[in-house]
């Protein structure tokens, strides 16, 4: 945990998050294999207002303006270490209050983005050039999110699966009753 504490930095300009994003990211990093974080200097939590004017106008390779993206992975270049930026204001922009208040949903929301960006970093350090960048990052994020969910919330599987089966049973019964009522008319 101490290694991950120094890895996460906050750099906001005139912005205060409604939740402790740093703590959320630190929790998520505990489920990342240490070798996948090799050569990664920091994970910077920031907002788009903290971007310079020049960087706000920059575009991603997909054509999206940098001011609209959720995260970005910067690789080692000209002696500068690799780091990841997460744009917290963009991530939380359309999120409902109950998604923020429930740690499980908040963790899943940030896990998808953080693990995706770490996936870009892992692809570079592992020289996995055969797979397209976004495909590799998405698969990596899905694998780590699944691992995180099973280890952190595994106890819910024993509770939720039977509950879902019961709910689906009720839904089938309701549909059958509706069909019979429609036939009688």
Task: Show the residue positions of the predicted features.
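Active-site recognition of the HExxH zinc-binding catalytic motif
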Residues: 112-125, 137
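Short pre-active-site segment immediately N-terminal to the catalytic Zn-binding motif
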Residues: 92-113, 128-129
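An active-site-proximal "capping" alpha-helix that borders the catalytic cofactor pocket
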Residues: 132-147
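Hydrophobic (often cysteine-bearing) scaffold residues that line and stabilize catalytic clefts
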Residues: 21, 111, 133
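Long, well-structured alpha-helical subdomains associated
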Residues: 2-7, 19-22, 148-185
């Amino acid at each position: 945990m101490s290694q991950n504490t120094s890895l996460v930095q906050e750099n906001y300009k005139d912005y205060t998050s409604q939740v402790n994003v740093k703590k959320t990211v630190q929790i998520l990093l505990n489920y990342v294999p240490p070798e996948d974080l090799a050569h990664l200097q920091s994970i910077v939590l920031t907002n788009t207002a903290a971007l310079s004017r020049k960087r706000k106008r920059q575009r991603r390779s997909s054509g999206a303006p940098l001011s609209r993206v959720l995260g970005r992975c910067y690789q080692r270049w000209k002696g500068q270490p690799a780091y990841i930026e997460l744009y917290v204001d963009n991530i939380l922009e359309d999120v409902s209050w109950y998604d923020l208040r429930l740690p499980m949903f908040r963790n899943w929301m940030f896990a998808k983005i953080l693990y995706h960006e770490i996936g870009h970093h892992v692809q570079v350090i592992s020289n996995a050039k055969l797979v397209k960048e976004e495909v590799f990052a998405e698969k990596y994020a899905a694998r780590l999110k699944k691992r995180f969910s099973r280890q952190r919330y595994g106890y819910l599987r024993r509770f939720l699966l039977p509950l879902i089966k019961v709910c689906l049973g009720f839904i089938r019964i309701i549909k059958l009753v509706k069909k019979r009522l429609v036939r009688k008319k």
